[in-house]
Amino acid sequence: MKVIFNADDFGLTQGVNQGIVKAHLDGVVKSTTLMVGMPAEQHAVQLAKQLPELKIGLHLRFTAGRPLTGERNLTDEHGVFTAYRDFWQRRDYQPEAIYHEAIAQVEHFLKLGLTLSHLDSHHHAHTHPQLAPIIYEVAKKYHVPLRDIGMAGEEAFGCRYHFTDFFYDQRLGIDPLMKHLLELKERFDLVEVMCHPAFVDPLLEKCSGYAKQREEELRILTSAQLIQLLVAHDIEITDYSALISAPLHSCV
Protein backbone atom coordinates (compact mmCIF):
# COMPACT_ATOMS: atom_id res chain seq x y z
CA MET A 1 0.00 0.00 0.00
CA LYS A 2 1.06 3.58 -0.67
CA VAL A 3 0.32 6.50 1.65
CA ILE A 4 0.15 10.22 0.97
CA PHE A 5 0.69 12.33 4.08
CA ASN A 6 -0.74 15.65 2.90
CA ALA A 7 -0.11 18.68 5.11
CA ASP A 8 -2.98 21.16 4.92
CA ASP A 9 -2.82 24.94 5.49
CA PHE A 10 0.50 25.85 3.84
CA GLY A 11 0.50 29.67 3.72
CA LEU A 12 -1.72 30.17 6.77
CA THR A 13 1.09 31.39 9.08
CA GLN A 14 4.87 31.29 9.04
CA GLY A 15 4.84 28.80 11.90
CA VAL A 16 2.61 26.49 9.87
CA ASN A 17 4.93 26.85 6.88
CA GLN A 18 8.02 26.05 8.93
CA GLY A 19 6.34 23.03 10.50
CA ILE A 20 5.34 21.64 7.12
CA VAL A 21 8.86 22.11 5.79
CA LYS A 22 10.33 20.26 8.78
CA ALA A 23 7.78 17.45 8.35
CA HIS A 24 8.93 17.21 4.74
CA LEU A 25 12.68 17.38 5.30
CA ASP A 26 12.79 15.22 8.43
CA GLY A 27 9.62 13.18 8.16
CA VAL A 28 6.96 11.58 6.00
CA VAL A 29 5.26 14.57 4.35
CA LYS A 30 5.77 14.69 0.60
CA SER A 31 2.64 16.66 -0.24
CA THR A 32 1.05 19.88 0.97
CA THR A 33 -1.72 22.26 -0.07
CA LEU A 34 -1.34 26.03 -0.21
CA MET A 35 -3.94 28.57 0.92
CA VAL A 36 -3.58 31.49 -1.50
CA GLY A 37 -4.42 34.98 -0.31
CA MET A 38 -3.54 34.21 3.31
CA PRO A 39 -0.99 36.01 5.53
CA ALA A 40 2.00 33.72 4.93
CA GLU A 41 1.41 32.95 1.25
CA GLN A 42 4.60 34.60 -0.01
CA HIS A 43 6.67 33.03 2.77
CA ALA A 44 5.31 29.64 1.74
CA VAL A 45 6.13 30.25 -1.92
CA GLN A 46 9.72 31.22 -1.08
CA LEU A 47 10.13 28.01 0.90
CA ALA A 48 8.42 25.88 -1.74
CA LYS A 49 10.78 27.00 -4.48
CA GLN A 50 13.68 25.60 -2.43
CA LEU A 51 11.99 22.20 -2.04
CA PRO A 52 11.63 20.53 -5.45
CA GLU A 53 10.56 17.20 -3.93
CA LEU A 54 7.60 18.72 -2.07
CA LYS A 55 4.46 18.43 -4.21
CA ILE A 56 2.11 21.36 -3.75
CA GLY A 57 -1.61 21.50 -4.35
CA LEU A 58 -4.22 24.18 -3.73
CA HIS A 59 -6.18 24.30 -0.46
CA LEU A 60 -9.30 26.07 -1.76
CA ARG A 61 -10.80 28.59 0.65
CA PHE A 62 -14.52 29.12 1.12
CA THR A 63 -14.60 29.42 4.93
CA ALA A 64 -11.52 31.54 5.76
CA GLY A 65 -10.35 34.98 4.70
CA ARG A 66 -11.76 37.00 1.83
CA PRO A 67 -12.63 35.83 -1.69
CA LEU A 68 -10.21 36.85 -4.42
CA THR A 69 -13.15 37.80 -6.64
CA GLY A 70 -15.04 39.84 -4.06
CA GLU A 71 -18.17 37.79 -4.86
CA ARG A 72 -20.77 39.02 -2.36
CA ASN A 73 -22.76 35.81 -2.58
CA LEU A 74 -19.88 34.04 -0.84
CA THR A 75 -19.41 36.45 2.07
CA ASP A 76 -20.97 37.90 5.17
CA GLU A 77 -21.71 41.58 5.66
CA HIS A 78 -18.03 42.27 6.37
CA GLY A 79 -16.82 40.87 3.06
CA VAL A 80 -15.24 37.74 4.51
CA PHE A 81 -16.23 34.19 3.68
CA THR A 82 -19.21 32.77 5.53
CA ALA A 83 -18.03 31.39 8.87
CA TYR A 84 -17.49 27.64 9.10
CA ARG A 85 -20.39 27.18 11.52
CA ASP A 86 -22.80 28.73 9.00
CA PHE A 87 -21.20 27.50 5.79
CA TRP A 88 -22.69 24.01 5.93
CA GLN A 89 -26.19 25.35 6.57
CA ARG A 90 -26.28 27.55 3.49
CA ARG A 91 -28.10 26.40 0.35
CA ASP A 92 -28.22 29.71 -1.50
CA TYR A 93 -24.78 29.77 -3.11
CA GLN A 94 -24.72 30.93 -6.72
CA PRO A 95 -22.93 28.39 -8.95
CA GLU A 96 -21.28 31.15 -10.99
CA ALA A 97 -19.84 32.75 -7.86
CA ILE A 98 -18.41 29.45 -6.67
CA TYR A 99 -16.92 28.66 -10.07
CA HIS A 100 -15.36 32.09 -10.57
CA GLU A 101 -13.81 32.07 -7.11
CA ALA A 102 -12.37 28.59 -7.52
CA ILE A 103 -10.91 29.52 -10.91
CA ALA A 104 -9.47 32.74 -9.45
CA GLN A 105 -7.71 30.81 -6.70
CA VAL A 106 -6.28 28.27 -9.14
CA GLU A 107 -5.05 31.00 -11.49
CA HIS A 108 -3.52 32.91 -8.57
CA PHE A 109 -1.69 29.73 -7.54
CA LEU A 110 -0.33 29.21 -11.05
CA LYS A 111 0.87 32.82 -11.30
CA LEU A 112 3.01 32.19 -8.22
CA GLY A 113 5.16 29.94 -10.41
CA LEU A 114 4.21 26.70 -8.69
CA THR A 115 3.20 23.41 -10.29
CA LEU A 116 -0.30 22.37 -9.22
CA SER A 117 -0.36 18.77 -7.97
CA HIS A 118 -4.01 18.52 -6.87
CA LEU A 119 -6.97 20.28 -5.26
CA ASP A 120 -8.53 19.99 -1.83
CA SER A 121 -10.15 22.55 0.46
CA HIS A 122 -10.15 24.13 3.89
CA HIS A 123 -12.70 22.48 6.18
CA HIS A 124 -13.55 20.04 3.34
CA ALA A 125 -15.60 22.82 1.75
CA HIS A 126 -15.49 21.16 -1.67
CA THR A 127 -17.80 18.43 -0.37
CA HIS A 128 -20.62 20.90 0.33
CA PRO A 129 -23.54 19.69 -1.84
CA GLN A 130 -23.61 22.93 -3.82
CA LEU A 131 -19.83 23.19 -4.25
CA ALA A 132 -18.99 19.54 -4.92
CA PRO A 133 -20.04 19.26 -8.59
CA ILE A 134 -18.55 22.65 -9.44
CA ILE A 135 -15.16 21.99 -7.85
CA TYR A 136 -15.12 18.60 -9.55
CA GLU A 137 -15.44 20.38 -12.91
CA VAL A 138 -12.66 22.78 -11.96
CA ALA A 139 -10.37 19.85 -11.16
CA LYS A 140 -11.18 18.33 -14.56
CA LYS A 141 -10.51 21.66 -16.28
CA TYR A 142 -6.97 21.73 -14.89
CA HIS A 143 -6.43 17.96 -15.18
CA VAL A 144 -5.55 17.45 -11.52
CA PRO A 145 -6.83 15.08 -8.84
CA LEU A 146 -9.39 16.28 -6.31
CA ARG A 147 -9.25 15.01 -2.75
CA ASP A 148 -12.11 12.56 -2.46
CA ILE A 149 -14.10 12.44 0.74
CA GLY A 150 -16.82 10.09 -0.38
CA MET A 151 -17.96 12.31 -3.24
CA ALA A 152 -17.10 9.94 -6.05
CA GLY A 153 -16.62 6.62 -4.29
CA GLU A 154 -13.65 4.52 -3.34
CA GLU A 155 -12.55 3.82 -6.91
CA ALA A 156 -12.88 7.37 -8.23
CA PHE A 157 -9.21 7.37 -9.23
CA GLY A 158 -9.17 4.02 -11.00
CA CYS A 159 -7.77 2.25 -7.96
CA ARG A 160 -8.76 1.51 -4.40
CA TYR A 161 -8.16 5.01 -3.01
CA HIS A 162 -9.23 6.19 0.42
CA PHE A 163 -9.01 9.53 2.22
CA THR A 164 -8.80 9.49 6.01
CA ASP A 165 -9.02 12.29 8.56
CA PHE A 166 -8.26 9.86 11.40
CA PHE A 167 -4.95 11.53 12.30
CA TYR A 168 -6.43 14.45 14.23
CA ASP A 169 -6.79 15.79 17.76
CA GLN A 170 -7.66 13.05 20.27
CA ARG A 171 -6.58 10.28 17.88
CA LEU A 172 -2.98 11.48 17.55
CA GLY A 173 -0.32 8.87 18.25
CA ILE A 174 2.00 6.50 16.44
CA ASP A 175 0.26 3.35 17.64
CA PRO A 176 -3.29 4.47 16.73
CA LEU A 177 -2.10 5.71 13.34
CA MET A 178 -0.29 2.48 12.50
CA LYS A 179 -3.24 0.37 13.62
CA HIS A 180 -5.52 2.43 11.39
CA LEU A 181 -3.19 2.16 8.38
CA LEU A 182 -2.80 -1.59 8.77
CA GLU A 183 -6.58 -1.98 8.83
CA LEU A 184 -6.84 0.07 5.64
CA LYS A 185 -4.01 -1.85 3.99
CA GLU A 186 -6.28 -4.86 3.62
CA ARG A 187 -8.77 -2.88 1.54
CA PHE A 188 -6.98 -0.09 -0.33
CA ASP A 189 -4.08 0.49 -2.71
CA LEU A 190 -3.52 4.12 -1.79
CA VAL A 191 -4.50 6.06 1.32
CA GLU A 192 -4.31 9.80 1.86
CA VAL A 193 -3.74 10.90 5.45
CA MET A 194 -4.72 14.49 6.24
CA CYS A 195 -2.30 16.18 8.63
CA HIS A 196 -1.58 19.64 10.04
CA PRO A 197 2.04 19.88 11.27
CA ALA A 198 3.13 23.30 12.52
CA PHE A 199 5.16 25.32 14.95
CA VAL A 200 2.61 27.30 16.94
CA ASP A 201 2.97 31.06 16.54
CA PRO A 202 0.77 33.92 17.82
CA LEU A 203 -1.13 34.25 14.55
CA LEU A 204 -2.00 30.56 14.51
CA GLU A 205 -3.28 30.75 18.08
CA LYS A 206 -5.44 33.69 17.04
CA CYS A 207 -6.90 32.26 13.85
CA SER A 208 -7.27 28.54 14.60
CA GLY A 209 -8.87 26.51 17.36
CA TYR A 210 -6.53 23.67 16.40
CA ALA A 211 -3.08 24.92 17.36
CA LYS A 212 -1.11 23.09 20.04
CA GLN A 213 -2.09 19.73 18.59
CA ARG A 214 -0.21 20.65 15.42
CA GLU A 215 3.12 20.48 17.24
CA GLU A 216 2.25 16.97 18.42
CA GLU A 217 1.44 16.06 14.83
CA LEU A 218 4.84 17.41 13.81
CA ARG A 219 6.58 15.31 16.45
CA ILE A 220 4.86 12.15 15.23
CA LEU A 221 5.35 12.85 11.52
CA THR A 222 9.10 13.30 12.03
CA SER A 223 9.46 10.31 14.34
CA ALA A 224 12.08 7.73 13.38
CA GLN A 225 9.80 5.11 14.93
CA LEU A 226 6.95 5.94 12.53
CA ILE A 227 9.26 5.81 9.53
CA GLN A 228 10.67 2.45 10.64
CA LEU A 229 7.20 0.99 11.18
CA LEU A 230 6.03 2.08 7.74
CA VAL A 231 9.05 0.39 6.16
CA ALA A 232 8.59 -2.74 8.25
CA HIS A 233 4.98 -3.08 7.10
CA ASP A 234 5.79 -2.39 3.44
CA ILE A 235 3.88 0.89 3.37
CA GLU A 236 5.39 3.26 0.82
CA ILE A 237 5.25 7.02 1.28
CA THR A 238 4.20 8.80 -1.90
CA ASP A 239 2.57 12.00 -3.17
CA TYR A 240 -0.14 12.99 -5.64
CA SER A 241 2.00 12.00 -8.60
CA ALA A 242 0.58 8.54 -7.83
CA LEU A 243 -2.73 9.97 -9.10
CA ILE A 244 -1.85 11.47 -12.46
CA SER A 245 -5.20 13.07 -13.20
CA ALA A 246 -8.62 12.45 -11.75
CA PRO A 247 -10.45 10.25 -12.35
CA LEU A 248 -9.32 8.34 -15.45
CA HIS A 249 -6.12 6.61 -14.40
CA SER A 250 -4.64 3.95 -12.17
CA CYS A 251 -2.53 4.28 -9.05
CA VAL A 252 1.09 3.92 -10.15
Curated annotation (Swiss-Prot):
Required cofactor(s): Mg(2+)
InterPro entries from the UniProt entry: COD_ChbG_bac, Glyco_hydro/deAcase_b/a-brl, YdjC-like
UniProtKB keywords: Carbohydrate metabolism, Hydrolase, Magnesium, Metal-binding
Enzyme Commission number(s) of this protein: 3.5.1.-
Pfam families linked: YdjC
BP GO terms, sorted: polysaccharide catabolic process
Annotated residues for binding of Mg(2+): 59, 122
GO molecular function: deacetylase activity; hydrolase activity, acting on carbon-nitrogen (but not peptide) bonds, in linear amides; metal ion binding
Family membership noted in the UniProt record: Belongs to the YdjC deacetylase family.
Subunit organization: Homodimer.
Chain's role: Probably catalyzes the deacetylation of acetylated carbohydrates an important step in the degradation of oligosaccharides.
Stated name of the protein: Carbohydrate deacetylase
Species for this entry: Vibrio cholerae serotype O1 (strain ATCC 39541 / Classical Ogawa 395 / O395)
